[in-house]
Amino acid sequence: MYTDPYFSRFVLPEDLKEALQKSRFLCYPETIEQLAEMSYGPAHSSRYDVSYSIAGKGLVKEAEVARCKNGTVVNFMEDYMRRRDPDCMSIGDDLPTDKPRFSDRYGYPFAELRKETMDWLSTQQLILLPFKAGGPYFGYESLMVCPVNAAFFALALANMQGFTSIFDVHDEYKPRAIIYVAPPFRHTHFNGRQAVIHQRCEDLHEVFSYNLYPGPSAKKGVFSMLLDIGEHEGWITNHASAAMLESPYENEVVFMHEGASGGGKSEMLEEIHEEEDGKLLLGVHTVTGEKHYLTLRETCKIHPIADDMVMAHKDMQDDGGFLKIVDAEDGWFLRMDGDTGYGCNAEYERLSIHPSEPLVFFNMDGVPGATCLIWEHIPDSDGTPCTNPRMIIPRRMTDNIIPGNEPQEVEVRSFGVRMPPSTDEHPDYGVMGMVQFVPVSLAWVWRLVSPRGYKNPSIADSNAGSGLKAEGVGSYWPFATGKKVTQANMLLHQMLDCPNTLNILIPNQHIGAYKVGFMGEWLVREYLARHNGTIKMKHLVPARCPIFGYSLDEMKLDGQYIRQTFLRPELQSHLEDGGYDAGAKILTDFFKEQLQQFLTDDLDPLGRQIIELVLRDAPLEDYLALTPMNLK
């Protein structure tokens, strides 16, 4: 039986405790540098193969780890393992869930596979990595159990959630969540597919990761843990980015931007993209080719808060009427597919080429001893660059970042949607104005549906005939393990408790016939930051489509007016009322289809009233009667 001076500090499930006691070797990393060095294998080589002996297949090479000047570069042998499989989640317990259960999917109880997993772990040399799920300041004590030869996986988790040295682990350390990593089971039990099984109980959330791509476990698996813990305790981890904008007039306004994949979360943290002459290309008319430009003498300074996961813990909240948030991560798992050559993203290129500490890269061309360049993506088997190149940037390396231990009040809560081009000849649902102001009731409805929308870069499937597909409650539903209605109720109350937060909708890609990319999002950010995150009712007009709330009657930036055709698309000559109404009907019909599933006995009565308004095409006034807007 294996024992060591640290093992007794942990309070663990009995079967895990037994497996660890049988293990040949347990490693407790003392420093993150030690953990990084372990990624290169026992010989500390410049290139290390992560392989496993699989019955009937022999030695299977899962990944290759290269030691580059600027960090650790990991590449998977299979194209399939270079990105998250959205169907990999199953639930291994009997608690309430709307997700597929393991027993239904595979035909036998998860308890059997759990025992096999523990038996396999007991034969391995293992890393025990304590960490804080939710970040180092407000997170929950957790643990990862991982084979030593997959140390890169532990390194990725430590960079995303923060490294905890074994020296900092106190006696009676009882994890609230545990991640188990057992890569061979992908081949022996799941026919080569990714599988991540969640097992929940009252005081423990366990994630069994049977594959080595960290997306569904070290990244989104932690998101699942936090959503489950929050469900028990009454708070939410939102799928959002957040930033404090400091205007040229020294106003400071905190934005939190939600949305389905491709909804503009990462763009909220980006500087405005300028043309070579410094002008801003507001939009290009898809019919006439006409271009509209704008010039800003000075733009807002961006102070990032969070990139993807925003913790709104109940203990942070007060009665001030604003949602208080912090980053739920200590490092960001950034997708670099848009960086296709030198100069595409100067900030991340600078951070990655000469980092202050070694980084971790995935799906990039890493040559031992050389510098990994974030625009050199590993080729997939067909010769094309991998579409999911990633790097992990610790928060502490990001310029102007808000410290992770300082909760911020959200003054503007935006929701982004990818929109298609829309004209009277070819009407589609891309008829939202550059910014729409909505009451809580409508802001909540948009988050229940979380439409993925037009030409999503991350998602291949689409809803037949419309290009629309719902990502589900809060856009975090793909990572939740419980019931949709439970999350819907929690989200409604989170928003009702923040009457002073301004709720807005922002389209990207197109506004009617104009191709705009993310320029609308950046300009709305600039406009509201200059107005201290507020708007006066006298500047609003009811949108022609009720679920869009109010439109802005005019927008002025640096003395320049934005054309009304961007604010109220029905005024566009190639769209007009007829094309607008046809496009709005596509969207509202989709909402009606998606909202039906929430009409259960467990839905909050106010939530039922709101959904019924959508189903009967109620006017904006009816939504305002249920949830008034706190505007002057």
Language model: regions and residue ranges:
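Long, basic/Gly/Ser/Thr-rich N-terminal segments
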Residues: 1-215
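Conserved NTP phosphate-binding and transfer environment spanning the P-loop NTPase/kinase superfamily
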Residues: 2-61, 334-632
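Flexible loop/turn segments at secondary-structure boundaries
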Residues: 137, 215, 263-266, 276-278, ...
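Short acidic, glycine/serine/threonine-rich loops at helix termini
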Residues: 139-144, 269-270, 315-319, 338
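N-terminal pre-Walker A segment at the start of P-loop NTPase domains
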Residues: 215-248
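Glycine-rich phosphate-binding P-loop
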Residues: 250-280
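Conserved, well-ordered active-site substructure
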Residues: 254-256, 319-333, 517-529
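Conserved nucleotide-sensing/catalytic segment adjacent to the nucleotide-binding pocket
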Residues: 281, 286-376
